[in-house]
A protein has these predicted regions:
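An N-terminal hydrophobic leader/cap segment in hydrolases
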Residues: 14-71
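Conserved alpha/beta-hydrolase
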Residues: 100, 107-129
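Short alpha-helix in the alpha/beta-hydrolase fold that links the catalytic acid
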Residues: 106, 236, 250-257
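Alpha/beta-hydrolase active-site loop
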Residues: 132-150, 155
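Gly/Ala-rich beta-loop-alpha elbow adjacent to hydrolase catalytic centers
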Residues: 158-167
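Hydrolase active-site cap/lid region
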Residues: 172-220
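Short beta-strand/loop motif that positions the catalytic acidic residue
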Residues: 233-235, 240-242, 246
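Catalytic histidine-centered segment of alpha/beta-hydrolase-like enzymes
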Residues: 272-284, 302, 307-313
Length: 347
């Protein structure tokens, strides 16, 4: 991947400058590939497959400090993971150049709805090991998490950008019935990636050979595993959230795809772009509501009600205690266990 998944195309007054830059880049990489292919590959990997550093905010660091931490191993790279809350989990999958904590706006609303949240830093990102990464490693990270000790708890995924691509690949490969919310997903990933290489001027023969090396290393195929080609095999429900002004991943891709598949729903936003969409409260609420509220939350309300009744029981006089005892038969045993010396009931 590049530092940007999609670049602005050559147009207007910049077209001649753009084409000139492409020719210079093509000449440079062709010469380097002919005379020092190993060096050429290293340069391309460093330029296009090495993510930039994501700087966490104080709020994000506080979330990380208060999470339960665990690790998984992806192709001999340690991947750092965090969990908040209890109950069934929703996995938060970040995109290229991001971090799991980038989706922190979803954590507390998920907990309020009875879910726990699990986030991770993909290989080469954040606190995880590695200097480079790829779509295939993103996919294997999610697949590994779903088969980890925490995997049986995962009920759905909220994924951003390349994380959405990897989520689609995972659901198809594992034949999972997971619900997924894909935010600004790169579903035509091959076209986006190839388009970027063409835009900057990397010769096609060179980047296709490099991608082939990644395919052989990780056991995937860029054409076969292009997310748009996998969607026809997926029957679980998917919600796509995409902004019309996204400068990175074209909104029209999500619109066209959602029109083709009955199990895919599209929620459109405006003026949020590619990243601000992750912090928008209406987007967060739409995503949480898509999974539905867990019964555990209702049980929690009942528990709070029970606690209030118990408190009233402790403070009440003899008549009030007797009435509470008779009105709440399901709580009698609990009342008696609280304070045997004060328990009041029919003799």
């Amino acid at each position: 991947m590049s530092t940007r998944l999609l670049a602005v195309g050559c147009n207007g007054t910049n077209v001649r400058l753009c084409k000139m830059r492409q020719r210079v880049t093509q000449t440079f990489f062709n010469f380097l590939w002919d005379h020092a292919p190993t060096v050429s590959k290293k340069i391309i990997k460093r330029l296009f497959f090495a993510p930039t550093t994501y700087k966490s905010t104080p709020v994000e660091r506080e979330y990380l400090d208060n999470a339960k931490k665990f690790e998984v191993s992806i192709h001999d790279k340690t991947v750092k993971c965090w969990k908040w809350g209890s109950g069934p989990s929703i996995l938060l999958a970040h995109g290229w150049n991001g971090r799991g904590i980038q989706l922190h706006h979803f954590i507390e609303p998920l907990r309020q709805s009875g879910y726990s949240a699990i986030a991770y830093d993909a290989p080469g990102h954040g606190e995880s090991q590695g200097r480079t990464s790829s779509y295939f490693e993103f996919t294997d990270t999610i697949r590994t998490l779903l088969t980890s000790p925490y995997g049986h708890e995962i009920r759905g995924v909220i994924a951003h950008s390349l994380g959405g691509s990897a989520t689609v690949n995972t659901i198809e490969k594992e034949n999972l019935p997971l619900k997924a919310v894909l935010i600004a997903p790169a579903l035509r990933l091959k076209e986006v990636l190839y388009g970027f290489f063409d835009y900057v001027g990397v010769p096609r023969t060179i980047y296709e050979l490099l991608i082939k090396e990644y395919e052989d290393q990780f056991g995937y195929n860029m054409h076969r595993d292009n997310p748009v080609n996998l969607l026809r095999e997926i029957h679980s429900k998917i919600l796509i959230i995409h902004d019309t002004n996204d400068p990175t991943i074209p909104y029209v891709d999500s619109k066209g795809i959602s029109d083709r598949f009955p199990n895919i729903e599209l929620h459109t936003t405006e003026r949020l772009g590619h990243k601000k969409v992750l912090a928008d409260s209406s987007v967060v609420n739409r995503a949480i509501n898509y999974f539905g509220e867990q019964p555990r939350k209702k049980e929690g309300k009942e528990m709070s009600k029970s606690i209030n009744i118990l408190e009233e029981y402790r403070k009440g006089d003899l008549d009030r205690r007797l009435n509470l005892f008779l009105e709440c038969p399901s709580l009698r045993a609990e009342f008696l266990e609280i304070d045997q010396s004060e328990a009041v009931g029919p003799s």
